Each structure stands twice: as structure tokens, then as C-alpha cells.
């Protein structure tokens, strides 16, 4: 028996199987999956299991940008599958470790494709007849057959006569069959005028799904589809009859074990936590901004959603966060923009000076601390400088789905505007404001806000800290609710606050006790005492080092926690925040 190579793309659904806010149940090689499309058009292929209690996610609710399990209400975001909300802990950030297993997914040729391995390329069409390139493509209904895929292919080969009426042929001799993709793709044609693609999906060792697409000079009529249904019933009955006979006369226990071993070989359930990416394109967007296209080596690009960022280890060793600029259909490489900061501590300078086409960089799985939330309100997108990157990603997604929105970009001058082609493509949704100083910007913002009812808009803003503070203040003054104002900082200008007095730290779970000395941060004291806390920006911006607190009088200096989270006293960003009392107890 030939081994099945799982490092390839498999069809698991048709485009029509994913209507708005639906979750589709599919099975590939014994792996159950929940397939769903978010409101930006991105498709997700997830393991059909909630990480919390194991309930099938196909029983859950597609809320537009997230999938909610119906058992305890845990919610997972489109793209990464990361948990975003736990109803039992409403005031706490979701657990970082709670993430649905995700699979690479593509939407091509009218089908949804996924893989359990690491395919080297993209899904391919089996069409090779030049006369049919411009034909009308119509997906026919998929047929589930209780038989092994090899048996179905064999029956299909032997029963082409069942399709005579479908093709309007005189006899089976007028039909031509070609097998591709290791018998998973069958192309049947009649003299170049009509063709049907059959794509075989191996659900389990004893069940397969036959997907089909007909190519015709014009839109196929009712008769063709009726005749196709009749023909596929003939194929299904014949294949299942053969399978039943084999089961009744053969001891297949050994074959079953062998097949399961073949199916599971080299399977990869989820993408890695980080990638090695090669720089395939580097473009100078402005005098101080470059864009980079980073293609993962050995893995397809993971699913992602607007507002996500990746962390990159730069050639000189710094870890920096960069927002994705990708449009919804750009699924080959991570696309980022990097501004060379005058006072760079090494990150942006290294990206500009050391990174060339061909350079390999370590990149994390995308995270989303700035999601585009589907609220049915009108999004006002406001960006300044390099803050355009996540805002542009959001705008492209909204534009593709035909949503109402507007984008305002504040820049020093036209020559300082990056991604000009992408921005121009947004048409009259784009408003560029050039050469405005801080006072002029503050004067302009009320004009933007006041033409809308405060209850009908969401505000998203990203850029320099003073600008974000100004946008937030103007929006609040206009009556826009705080929870409808969302922002992301790239960096803070303030120096990292350090302790001016010694205080004690106790770890509740281990009982360890140590002190934070004057001139040190809580994070540094933890690391010095072998307390492992993951950290990244060390400026209170990214949220990576968020740490639970049991007790202590906290002094917050971050921009990550919400006002409600700060007031709860349950969380601290140890990279910049500190304790005002003599002792802090961490829930570690």
C-alpha cells in the first residue's frame, strides 16, 4: 500500500458551504474540523474542539470576528484561534495558553483547502484544457460516500456511462478521463466543450466526500444538475455496494491499523509558535520607512485578522513588534512597515541597516491586541505617521467586505506617506491631512467626529502617544463611549519608571520572597531571581508581561491595561509599573 503524503492541500468544502456567520463541519483523514468565515472574508480551519472542555466548536456561534463555544462561552478570535473572552472571569485578560489548534487554509478555485502537514506550494487546479479556461465554473453539490477513496475512484472510472446525459454525449466513448493529484483529482471532459472536476476528500479510512465543479460555455441549466445528481447516486450506490462486499468477506483489522498509521504520519495539527521567515521583498516607502515581505520557510502563512502584529528578533538581537499591513487576500508573506527612529535603541536601525532580501528572521505567531470588532457601528480610523500600518490593514478588510467606514491619515508631508498605492485604492474613504501641527490636529478632529452621532461610531487610532491621547480626548468630549475608542501605541516617549524605594515581592504559589531595589523595575527583579516572565517591548505597550496580583498598592505606568483593569488591582505590567506599598504579592 502506498503511503499518503499529508504535506499537500486537500479540499474540504466549497465556497458555498460557508455562508455568513455559519460554522461548517468537515473531517479530513479522521481529523474533525470547524470551518468558518469571519466578516472580513477570511476563512478559518480549526480543530473541532474547544480547549476548555472539549465541546465541538461546530455547535458554537460565529459572531463575525470570533467563534464562541456554547458550553461555557469561551470566545476565540479569527486567525490565531487565541482565547479573547472568558465569561467567568470578565475582568481578567484571557489565558494566553488557551488557543484552538488551527490548520493552514486557502480559498481557491471555488473550494476551501487545508492540510495536516506542510505543503510546499499553493492548491492547484487540475484544469489543463485551454478551451475551457474562460468557461463558466459552477460548483455542484458534494456527495458523501461510505467507501474508501480508492474504491470510489475505481467505480468512477468503470461507470463513465452514468454521465452520458450530464455531458450530452452519444456514448461513454465520447468522454475522456484524466487522473491527477494522486487520484484525488479526476477530470472528465467531452471534446473540450464541457468538463467536470472531481476532487476527492478522504474523510476517514471508510468514508470520502466527492466535490465537483462543472465548466460550461454558459450557466448550466436545471437538466444538467438533475442528471449529475442521478449519475452520482449511481456512483455512490455502486461504491458502497463494493465496500460492503469487501467488509463481509475480508478481515480488515490489520489494514485498518496500517491505514491509520499512514494517515497520521508527519501530521502537524497546529502552526508553530514562531517561524523562520525569509525577506523576499524590501521596498523603500519613504525616506525613513521601509516595507518588508517576510515569507515563512517550510510553513504556509497562518490565518490572521486585522490589527494583528508579529514580534521579530532583529539581526542585532532586539525583539520588536510590527503590525501587519496585509490585505485580506495577501496570504503568502507577512507584510510590515518599519520606520527608522532617530533615537533607535537598535531595533529599527538594525531592520534598516542589516535586513536585505534573503535575510532570515525569527518571527512569532501573530497576536491581536488591537482587533477590529464587528459592532455594526461606523468605524472612524485615525492614523499618524507609521501608525498607518494596522489602520491600513483594517481599512483594506472593511473595504473588501463593503462596510461603511472612513480613514483619516495625518502626516508631515506627501513624501512622508508610505503605502501610497494601497491608500489610493481606498478611494473616497481616504482623507489625508498634511502638515498639521499638534494644535491644528486638535482643531481638526472635532470636525471629523461631530458629523456622526456619538452612539453610532467606533474610533480606532494608532500613532504617536500625544496624538492618540488627543484623539481619545476629543472622542470622549464628543460623547463617544470609552469602550468604543480603541488604540494601539507603537512606543512611549516616557522613560521607564523605576523604583525609588525598596519593596518586597512575594510569590503566592511558591512562597518565594525577594526585594525590588531602588533604581530597578519589578520585571528586572523577577528575572534576577529566576522568576520567568515573558516580556517583549519593556515599555508597557505590548501586554506580553502582564502579571496577576493578589495584593499591593499599585502604581500603573503602562498603556495596555484598561481603566477598569487598573482599578481592579488584579494586574500589573512589571516592565514599567510598580508598588507604592511595602509589599506586593504576585499570583505566581
From Swiss-Prot:
Top-level EC class: oxidoreductase
UniProt-listed Enzyme Commission number(s): 1.-.-.-
Gene3D superfamilies (alphabetical): 3.10.20.30, Nucleotide-binding domain of ferredoxin-NADP reductase (FNR) module (3.40.50.80), Rieske [2Fe-2S] iron-sulphur domain (2.102.10.10), Translation factors (2.40.30.10)
Binding sites annotated in the UniProt record for [2Fe-2S] cluster: 50, 52, 69, 72, 537, 542, 545, 575
Domain Rieske: 9-114
Gene Ontology molecular function, alphabetical: 2 iron, 2 sulfur cluster binding; metal ion binding; oxidoreductase activity
GO biological process, one term: alkaloid catabolic process
Cofactor note: Binds 1 [2Fe-2S] cluster per subunit.
Domain 2Fe-2S ferredoxin-type: 503-588
InterPro entries in UniProt: 2Fe-2S_ferredoxin-like_sf (IPR036010), 2Fe-2S_ferredoxin-type (IPR001041), 2Fe2S_fd_BS (IPR006058), Beta-grasp_dom_sf (IPR012675), FAD-bd_FR_type (IPR017927), FNR_nucleotide-bd (IPR039261), MRET (IPR050415), Riboflavin_synthase-like_b-brl (IPR017938)
Domain of life: Bacteria
Keywords, alphabetical: 2Fe-2S, Alkaloid metabolism, Flavoprotein, Iron, Iron-sulfur, Metal-binding, Oxidoreductase
A Pfam family annotated for this UniProt entry: Rieske
Domain (FAD-binding FR-type) ranges: 272-373
Co-factor requirement: [2Fe-2S] cluster
Cross-referenced SUPFAM superfamilies: 2Fe-2S ferredoxin-like, Ferredoxin reductase-like, C-terminal NADP-linked domain, ISP domain, Riboflavin synthase domain-like
Function: Involved in the caffeine degradation, which is the essential first step for assimilating the carbon and nitrogen in caffeine. Catalyzes the oxidation of NADH and transfers electrons to NdmA and NdmB, which catalyze the N-demethylation reactions.
Additional record remark: It is probably a fusion between a ferredoxin and a reductase into a single ORF which encodes a functional reductase that is specifically coupled to NdmA and NdmB.
Protein name: Oxidoreductase NdmD
Species this chain originates from: Pseudomonas putida (Arthrobacter siderocapsulatus)
Organism placement in taxonomy: Bacteria, Pseudomonadati, Pseudomonadota, Gammaproteobacteria, Pseudomonadales
Amino acid at each position: 500500500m502506498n503511503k499518503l503524503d499529508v504535506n499537500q492541500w486537500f479540499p474540504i468544502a466549497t465556497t458555498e458551504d460557508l455562508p455568513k456567520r455559519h460554522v461548517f463541519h468537515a473531517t479530513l483523514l479522521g481529523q474533525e474540523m470547524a470551518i468558518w468565515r469571519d466578516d472580513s472574508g477570511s476563512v478559518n480551519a480549526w480543530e473541532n474542539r474547544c480547549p476548555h472542555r472539549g465541546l465541538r466548536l461546530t455547535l458554537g456561534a460565529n459572531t463575525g470576528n470570533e467563534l464562541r463555544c456554547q458550553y461555557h462561552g469561551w470566545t476565540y478570535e479569527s486567525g490565531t484561534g487565541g482565547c479573547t473572552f472568558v465569561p467567568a472571569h470578565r475582568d481578567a485578560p484571557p489565558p494566553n495558553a488557551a488557543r484552538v489548534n488551527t490548520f493552514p487554509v486557502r480559498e481557491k478555485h471555488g473550494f476551501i483547502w487545508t492540510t495536516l502537514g506542510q505543503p510546499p506550494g499553493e492548491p492547484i487546479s487540475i484544469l489543463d484544457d485551454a478551451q475551457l479556461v474562460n468557461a463558466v465554473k459552477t460548483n455542484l453539490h458534494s456527495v458523501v460516500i461510505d467507501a474508501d477513496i480508492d474504491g470510489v475512484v475505481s467505480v468512477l472510472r468503470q461507470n463513465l456511462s452514468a454521465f452520458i446525459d450530464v455531458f450530452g454525449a452519444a456514448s461513454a466513448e465520447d468522454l475522456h478521463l484524466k487522473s491527477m493529484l494522486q487520484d484525488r483529482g479526476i477530470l472528465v471532459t467531452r471534446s473540450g466543450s464541457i468538463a467536470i472536476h472531481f476532487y476527492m476528500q478522504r474523510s476517514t479510512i471508510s468514508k470520502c466526500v466527492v466535490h465537483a465543479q462543472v465548466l460550461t460555455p454558459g450557466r448550466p441549466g436545471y437538466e444538467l444538475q438533475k442528471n449529475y445528481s442521478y449519475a452520482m447516486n449511481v456512483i455512490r450506490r455502486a461504491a458502497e455496494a463494493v465496500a460492503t462486499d469487501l467488509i463481509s468477506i475480508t478481515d480488515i483489522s490489520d489494514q485498518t491499523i496500517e491505514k491509520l498509521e499512514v494517515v497520521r504520519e508527519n501530521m502537524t495539527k497546529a502552526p508553530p509558535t514562531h517561524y523562520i521567515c525569509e525577506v523576499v521583498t524590501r521596498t523603500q516607502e519613504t525616506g525613513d520607512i521601509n516595507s518588508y515581505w517576510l515569507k515563512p520557510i517550510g510553513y504556509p502563512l497562518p490565518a490572521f485578522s486585522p490589527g494583528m502584529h508579529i514580534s521579530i528578533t532583529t539581526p542585532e538581537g532586539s525583539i520588536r513588534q510590527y503590525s501587519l499591513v496585509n490585505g485580506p487576500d495577501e496570504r503568502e508573506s507577512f507584510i510590515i512597515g518599519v520606520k527608522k527612529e532617530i533615537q533607535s535603541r537598535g531595533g529599527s536601525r538594525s531592520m534598516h541597516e542589516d535586513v536585505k532580501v534573503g535575510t532570515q528572521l525569527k518571527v512569532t505567531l501573530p497576536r491581536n491586541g488591537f482587533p477590529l470588532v464587528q459592532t455594526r457601528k461606523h468605524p472612524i480610523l485615525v492614523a499618524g505617521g507609521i501608525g498607518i500600518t494596522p489602520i491600513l490593514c483594517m481599512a483594506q478588510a472593511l473595504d473588501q467586505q463593503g462596510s461603511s467606514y472612513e480613514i483619516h491619515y495625518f502626516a508631515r508631508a506627501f513624501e512622508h506617506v508610505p503605502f501610497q498605492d494601497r491608500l489610493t485604492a481606498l478611494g473616497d474613504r481616504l482623507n489625508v491631512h498634511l502638515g498639521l501641527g499638534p494644535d491644528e490636529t486638535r482643531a481638526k478632529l472635532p470636525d471629523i467626529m461631530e458629523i456622526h452621532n456619538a452612539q453610532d461610531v467606533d474610533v480606532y487610532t494608532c500613532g504617536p502617544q500625544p496624538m492618540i491621547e488627543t484623539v481619545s480626548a476629543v472622542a470622549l468630549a464628543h460623547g463617544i463611549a470609552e469602550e468604543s475608542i480603541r488604540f494601539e501605541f507603537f512606543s512611549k516617549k516616557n522613560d521607564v519608571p523605576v523604583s525609588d524605594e525598596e519593596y518586597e515581592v512575594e510569590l503566592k504559589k511558591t512562597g518565594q520572597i525577594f526585594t525590588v531595589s531602588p533604581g530597578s523595575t519589578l520585571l528586572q527583579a523577577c528575572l534576577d531571581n529566576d522568576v520567568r516572565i515573558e516580556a517583549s517591548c519593556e515599555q508597557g505597550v505590548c501586554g506580553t508581561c502582564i502579571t496577576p496580583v493578589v495584593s499591593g498598592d499599585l502604581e500603573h505606568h503602562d498603556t495596555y491595561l484598561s481603566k477598569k483593569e487598573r482599578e481592579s488591582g488584579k494586574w500589573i505590567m512589571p516592565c514599567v509599573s510598580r508598588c507604592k506599598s511595602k509589599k506586593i504579592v504576585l499570583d505566581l
